[in-house]
Amino acid sequence: MARQEQQQHLQVLSALDAAKTQWYHFTAIVVAGMGFFTDAYDLFCISLVTKLLGRIYYTDLAKENPGSLPPNVAAAVNGVAFCGTLAGQLFFGWLGDKLGRKSVYGMTLLMMVICSIASGLSFSHTPTSVMATLCFFRFWLGFGIGGDYPLSATIMSEYANKKTRGAFIAAVFAMQGFGILAGGIVTLIISSAFRAGFPAPAYQDDRAGSTVRQADYVWRIILMLGAMPALLTYYWRMKMPETARYTALVAKNAKQAAADMSKVLQVEIQEEQDKLEQMVTRNSSSFGLFSRQFARRHGLHLVGTATTWFLLDIAFYSQNLFQKDIFTSINWIPKAKTMSALEEVFRIARAQTLIALCGTVPGYWFTVFLIDIVGRFAIQLLGFFMMTVFMLGLAVPYHHWTTKGNHIGFVVMYAFTFFFANFGPNSTTFIVPAEIFPARLRSTCHGISAAAGKAGAIIGSFGFLYAAQDPHKPDAGYKPGIGVRNSLFVLAGCNLLGFICTFLVPESKGKSLEEMSGEAEDDDDEVAAAGGGAAVRPQTA
């Protein structure tokens, strides 16, 4: 089978698989990665400013505590971008297979730039109108962000060589960690600058004066700055040629694929149009997504990539979105009434930046350095297992962690759950769908898997706003929930299910994309391929 694949393989694809790491690889990582930097910044920075939005637009000076967003508004502001992302992943994933990766790639970036700026310009003076406008633009921001998931992963996988493909895709995704970190740092800088320029007393000392008028600029500037990295990389994204695998295997233009990659790799590559036509004639397996052939060859794989991403994102996004409430519950952030509005923003940003620096960013880069050594399967299993362990380690002795003197231990344990999410399923669930499906369906299947993940993120962001409420003392406007401790038990259960579902996902380390997808096989080999899941399944002995 290996010899047959070698005979059928186009020279342009073999050249890409065997290429040494070159400058164009790093260029592709930066160009694609800046999209993820922007994605993470835009999606996570909203959790830093929700408390500020509540103070500005929903404070009742007759009440003892500063205002907070009503439950339905908080759920919408936190979760609406995820709804847009889910829709964008499905739409642009499908479009990337129909029109080509490059032609769709610029659309997503422009949407991110325009909607990031528009989010900060949300107009009107009534709270309802401002929040409605903000949610409208954040939905379309999420729609653009959604397209970046399948397109960036697919482009990087189709550009990369076989030996270090996992590290290259992981490096693109790792820019998400820097985006989260940047969101925290930018918020720290802006809140510090405004706090120094417009000092204000704590809410309990001066209810009206604790939120200065200029605080309304703070959240707008933070959201609008998300447009900058995307804008800076637009030109370079448009200069990238279409991937050779799309041009050759989907558009059936071997001449153009060879010409494009000859420039990129700086080597002479034969056109081999005749060979491509022979391959098309010999291998007519142009089955669609909803065909029996796809179900036999890749059905369980798609179920595996979708369910693991879904379960991971329930835990991952709920942690990020209610971490400010966790910090409050362990007294890492003082009670709101003891701070001014800008002081509260500063303290929330400082806490999130510390978690990103210690737990989030290192986990991504451990994946980059180790994924092509130990494989995707082992990293994903380890990640889900350790997340389960640390979640239980937080939940079982939760009352111990919340007593005086034990708060730092809680934060360390909490940081480890983020570390093993990123040195684990948060990275691998992004990588594997870009490697195991046929070129003509690769972007679509990645989009489906990613959309399943965002469905989990929606459950996490909407559901846990309510679930994490204290059963005895819920926040104003909320019904009693199951509390942070029981929420952590639920998240541990999600991680355990993710561990089990990982066994549906094949190992792709060291294999070509065509070997994983079965595109190098004849129709005569279809039966073998249909039962060949075991051939690419990880060895667990």
UniProtKB/Swiss-Prot annotation:
Q: Does the keyword Ribonucleoprotein apply?
A: no
Q: Which SUPFAM superfamilies match?
A: MFS general substrate transporter
Query: Which sequence ranges are marked TM in the entry?
Result: 29-49, 75-95, 103-123, 127-147, 169-189, 216-236, 298-318, 354-374, 377-397, 405-425, 448-468, 487-507
Residue numbers spanned by region Disordered: 514-541
One molecular function GO term is: phosphate transmembrane transporter activity
Q: Which residues are on the Extracellular side of the membrane?
A: 50-74, 124-126, 190-215, 319-353, 398-404, 469-486
Q: Where in the cell is it found?
A: Membrane
Keywords in alphabetical order: Membrane, Phosphate transport, Symport, Transmembrane, Transmembrane helix, Transport
Q: Write out the topological domains of type Cytoplasmic.
A: 1-28, 96-102, 148-168, 237-297, 375-376, 426-447, 508-541
Miscellaneous field: Although related to the sugar transporter family, it does not transport sugars.
Similarity section: Belongs to the major facilitator superfamily. Phosphate:H(+) symporter (TC 2.A.1.9) family.
Query: What protein is this chain from?
Result: Probable inorganic phosphate transporter 1-8
Tell me the organism: Oryza sativa subsp. japonica
User: What gene makes this protein?
Assistant: PHT1-8
